Amino acid sequence: MKFKERFNEVLKQSGKKQTEIALALNLSKQCVNDYRTGKTLPSIETLYLLCKYLDVSADYLLGLSDY
């Protein structure tokens, strides 16, 4: 799976909204939407924050692990 697919899956499972994530991580809503649609990928720093906030590993989001 690609990052956008994993990211969308984790968002759905977490029940968190794009706006909520954007506010919590000081990102724009457009930025979060770009991650969801695959337009862009997060920086390493943002990936770390996303993983911490969503309680998921970077390996999982990047498709390197199924856990």
Residue ranges and their predicted role:
Residues N26, E45-Y60:
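DNA major-groove recognition helix of helix-turn-helix/homeodomain DNA-binding modules
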Residues R6, K17, S43-T46, S57:
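Residues that mark the N-terminal boundary/hinge immediately upstream of a DNA-recognition element
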Residues K12, L23, K52:
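Alpha-helical residues within the helix-turn-helix
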Residues F7, I21-A22, V32-Y35, L61:
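Conserved hydrophobic/aromatic packing and binding residues within compact polymer-binding modules
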Residues N26-L41:
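Recognition helix of helix-turn-helix/homeodomain-like DNA-binding domains
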Residues M1-K16:
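A short, Lys/Arg-rich alpha-helix, primarily the initiator
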Residues L11, R36, L54, L62-S65:
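DNA major-groove recognition helix of helix-turn-helix
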